[in-house]
């Protein structure tokens, strides 16, 4: 997977405010984590094999101090399959309204089939619990995306 994000404005703001932050890219299963106060996983866990997700969260838990936070932003699915289908259709309509063609939406969906494996919010919360996180809260949801915060 390749991607590029222009973080220059953020880096300038961070430097001005004297905020210490690391951004890294790599295989989280192979990366040694140092201690962080907050770790943000944005659209990451959904691409990790389901069998490896709990060990990734344990690894993150162990790299946080007591009171440290994980912020998890993920594409989700709904338990109710009818609702899930409706929300996905709403998401595709949203993408069309924002300039995506039906063909590009279809091609991306096909490319991500069996690669992006979303969980329900409850399944993600359960994974966090099994990794020993506490105070697990869903704090934002839009269509089939959710933001969850948890504390070590």
What is the meaning of each model-derived region?
Residues 75-131:
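C-terminal alpha-helical "lid/dimerization" subdomain adjacent to the S-adenosyl-L-methionine
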Residues 1-31:
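Class I SAM-dependent methyltransferase SAM/SAH-binding core
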Residues 125-152:
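Core SAM-dependent methyltransferase catalytic element
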Residues 39-40, 128:
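Hydrophobic beta-strand segment of the Class I
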Residues 54-66:
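A short glycine-rich, Lys/Arg-flanked "PGG" loop and its adjoining helix->strand segment in the class I
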Residues 41-45, 73:
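Residues lining the SAM
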Residues 29-39:
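A short acidic, Gly/Pro-enriched loop at the edge of an enzyme's catalytic core
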Residues 64-75:
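Conserved beta-strand signature within the Rossmann-like core of class I S-adenosyl-L-methionine
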């Amino acid at each position: 997977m390749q991607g590029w994000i222009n973080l220059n404005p953020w880096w300038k703001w961070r430097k001005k405010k004297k905020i210490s932050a690391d951004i890294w890219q790599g295989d989280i299963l192979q990366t040694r984590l140092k201690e962080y106060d907050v770790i943000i996983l944005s659209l990451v866990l959904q691409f990790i094999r389901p069998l490896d997700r709990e060990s990734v969260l344990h690894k993150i838990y162990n790299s946080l101090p007591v009171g440290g936070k994980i912020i998890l932003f993920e594409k989700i699915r709904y338990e109710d399959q009818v609702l899930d289908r409706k929300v996905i259709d709403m998401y595709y309509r949203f993408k069309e309204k924002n300039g995506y063609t039906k063909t590009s939406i279809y091609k991306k969906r096909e490319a991500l089939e069996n690669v992006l494996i979303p969980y329900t919010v409850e399944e993600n919360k359960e994974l966090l619990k099994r990794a020993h996180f506490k105070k697990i809260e869903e704090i934002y949801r839009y269509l089939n995306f959710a933001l969850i915060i948890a504390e070590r």
